[in-house]
A protein has these predicted regions:
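Structural recognition of the beta-strand scaffold that forms the well-ordered cores
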Residues: 30-35, 39-40, 72-77, 105-110, ...
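C-terminal motif of bacterial Sec signal peptides marking the signal peptidase cleavage site
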Residues: 16-18
């Protein structure tokens, strides 16, 4: 959570830049938060905003940033979301992009991990057969991630052509060369693979942001 809070100044600067031209009757800037649990979750000490299945915390980084910037926030981030959930309806949740408006000023995007089996990757930190069982599938998913992310950006720009877009990456589950009693049963080669997988996801997220005129912030 502390790392996500360091993201707030970047949002503030971006919003100031996006709203540099004063209107005749100033209106609060419109900020839309899209993404997965990295954007939805915060501490567990406050009640959740509905729907509770999204685990959308009242002290998530979008909520804190919106208060800091005095912005009108539409927060549709949801735990477990993938690029498919951003672009299309999934059960009780409408497509996240439906929250975008033509006059949206700022969009934060925290997405991509679940397209590459991020939950399975978290299990790999304590699973000594993870790479053998899931490695090939996760590799294919990471390779396909740029295409999926480009589709998301295409839709964001179509719906909110003047919005500034900030993209976030994912914190490492295991650092290269790291060892501790909790993970010592995992072969060194598997630990390196896990660290590299998160690096590849972040690389895909960063490069997609650069291709599509967004700003990447880890």
């Amino acid at each position: 959570m502390a790392c996500m809070r360091r993201f707030i100044p970047f949002l503030s600067v971006a919003l100031l830049a996006a709203c540099s031209t004063p209107a005749e009757e100033p209106q609060p800037p419109h900020y839309v938060a899209l993404g997965d649990s990295y954007a939805a979750m915060g501490s567990t000490t406050l009640p959740l905003d509905p729907p509770n299945t999204c685990v959308r915390a009242q002290d998530s980084y979008p909520e804190l940033a919106a208060k800091e910037m005095d912005a009108e926030l539409t927060n549709v981030a949801c735990q477990g979301a993938s690029t498919l959930d951003v672009l299309s309806s999934a059960g009780e949740h409408p497509a996240q992009v439906d929250a975008l408006r033509e006059d949206t000023d700022l969009v934060s995007l925290s997405i991509g991990g679940n397209d590459a089996s991020f939950v399975r990757l978290t299990q790999c930190a304590t699973d000594d057969i993870c790479q053998a069982e899931s490695g090939p599938q996760i590799d294919l998913e990471i390779r396909d991630l740029p295409r999926r992310l480009d589709k998301v950006y295409e839709e964001i720009h179509r719906r909110s052509p003047d919005a500034k877009v900030l993209a976030t990456g994912y914190l490492p589950l295991i650092k290269r060369g790291e060892t501790c009693p909790y993970i010592e049963k995992i072969p060194a080669s598997d630990r390196e693979w896990l660290a590299r997988s998160i690096e590849r996801i972040n690389q895909a997220v960063r490069e997609a942001a650069e291709r599509n005129g967004a700003t990447y912030v880890l």
